[in-house]
Each structure stands twice: as structure tokens, then as C-alpha cells.
Amino acid sequence: MRSGKRIISVLAAVVLMMLPAGCDFMRITEDLSDCATLFSVKYNVTLRTNLTTQVQTVLRSRFENEVADLLEDSLKNIFREYAHDVDLSFYPGEERSFHDSHIMDAGQATYSLELPVNDYRHLALANLADEVEVDLTQSQWVQRSYLSQIVGDTIQGHNTGLFTARQDMNILGNVDQEFDVTLYMVNCASILVIRTDSVGYSQGVAYRDCQVYSSDFADGFMVNDSTFTHRTNPTVHDFRVTNPPVKREIYYAVTFPSCDTPEEAQTLPDTRADNSQTGSTEEDRIWRKYVYVTLPNGDVTRTIINVKMPLQAGQVMIIYAYMRPDGSIYSPNVEVSTSVSLKWKDGLDIETGE
């Protein structure tokens, strides 16, 4: 080894508990310094979720096993301890000095790289490459690094599970060091299961179309501070699960979390134009789903589902509901209330799916 310089290797091991382990190696030699030391970083992608509990409590307890299996299959590529790609940034000060993006697609990955000896703030993110609704912006500066949801009055939900971590690293000279960094999920999912064979209507309700939207969720995430922003309040068009069981409809939206309290939720901008027609909704609600059912005669029934429980990062909430013959939706869940508008709005301004 030449005097004044040592090889620096960084071990970046992403431990994925549900996947087989594999390794990949990369050497990065840009921006080297004569002051360097050996250190390692172990990355753990950790999912703390209540998905299985929600499915068991809300669906399987009602013998909705086919719905439960279909829903779990639909969400399996989002709610999992897995990193398709990682984005790694190191900041000796406000501005970034080193950055690496790497496609992983494995349960475990090891990187060898060289960095100057220094005090670093390290930000790590996973699964950004395939996420079309969220961008990483201003990541050149540690305090501004931001997961920004695309701007729009109506947007689609996220299609990947997003994980982030942040940690201070004091890289010393002539000392072998190892750091443990855990990445946690920052998005969540709200799910609506609708039965169209309500009590007394075993043949099922006749309707032409059903569309579901969600609102009152965060629009971004400050990576360094680990805080969510609510600068705007976009409406998210829920995804409809295809080929549901007979007389069932399944919708979900993967988003950033909601506010924590009704008081915070009441301060959000209300961007849905149709809300002005009916005035304010429940004051104790934290987030909402809007259900638009088009009946065979063309009339539209709108139901606002007001949810009183916060939806946090990594979590899911399943709302089990029923459709009445007039197209209205009701749920036995005590944590939700509904507001119904029959023959809602001439000149419907929503996507009808037709």
C-alpha cells in the first residue's frame, strides 16, 4: 500500500428478510483524497406494517378469503422488504460531495468505495427508479433533499414502496468502522372493499360505473428531517383491482401518510371543487374517500367517506362497505362516517371509466 493512502471500502448490505440473499460489488474511485480510512455500512430495509393484521381482521374474519388473497397479491410488490434500487448521498456540509445510484434487485448487496475522511450526513433511499408519481428533488443539498409528488389536481397513487434513512457518520482515520443504517417505508395504502349485495339485495345492486378517489394526504417528504409536507392537497384516483369476486369491488390508493389529527387536517387546502356544493364535511375526519356510482339511468350518487383515524407510514387501512340500490355507500366501521349526495351534479366532471 502506498504511503499516505489507504483503501476505503464501504459495505452496503441490504438485508431483506423475506428474500434470498445475493451480493453485488462495485468500486467507486471518483473524488478520492489522500486521507482515507476503512469503514462499512450495513443497510437494513425494514417494513413495519399492519397489512396482514388488517386483512385478517377485516376480510378473513368475514370469510372474504378470495378478496383477501387478491388484495395481498395486488400489494405484494409494494409492501415488502425489498430494494430494487438504492440512492446514496454523503454530505460533509450542506452540499453533497458524493452520490451513487445502483440497481440492486437482490436480498443483499455489498459495495466497495473510497471516500475522504470527514464527518458526513448520509441519506439513503430505495425504490425510486420505477416510481412514476414521486421524484427526488434538490438532493444536492442535505436540507433540501425532498421526495416530491407530481403536481396535479388529480393524480395516480404510488406504484412502489418507498424507503428512506438518514444517519450521521464520523469517518475517522486509521480506524476500522461499521455503521448500521435502517431504511423505513414512507408511504402507505388506503383500501376500500365494496359489497354490492347488501342485506335484502342478494342479486346485487345494478350500476353502470364506480370510481373512487382519495384526498387529505401529504404531498412530499423532507428526507433529512424525516417530515411530511402538506403544501397542496391533490386528489388521488384509486386503482381498481381487476377481476374481483362476484358482487365485490376493490379499490386502493398508495400515498404518503395523512395528518395525525383532525385539527391538522382541517388546515389543508380543499382542492375538490365539488365540496363547495355541500359545505364542510365532518370536523373530526382526518382523510376522505370519494365514491361516485353511476346508476343505469345515468344518475350519479356521490358518497364521501370521512375517516377519523390517521394513516401512518407503512400502514394500511381497509374500509369494508356496502352499496345500496340508490348507489350510496355505507360502512359498519365505527371509525368512518359517510355523507351522501343523490343525483349529484349535472355534467359530471370525473373519469367515468367508459
What annotation goes with each model-predicted range?
Residues M1-D24:
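Sec-dependent bacterial lipoprotein signal peptides
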Residues S40-N44, D87, R121-L123, E178-D180, ...:
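Beta-strand secondary-structure signal
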Residues L71-L136, Q203-Q315, D349-E354:
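Tryptophan-paired
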Residues D105-G107, A129-E178, G298-I329:
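Structured interaction patches on ligand/partner-binding surfaces of diverse proteins
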Residues S33-T46, D69-S74, M185-A189:
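Short coil/turn motif common to extracellular beta-sandwich-like domains
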Residues M18-Q54, D346, T352:
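Bacterial Sec-dependent N-terminal signal peptides
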Residues V151-S202, Y322-E354:
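Compositionally biased low-complexity segments at domain edges in trafficked proteins
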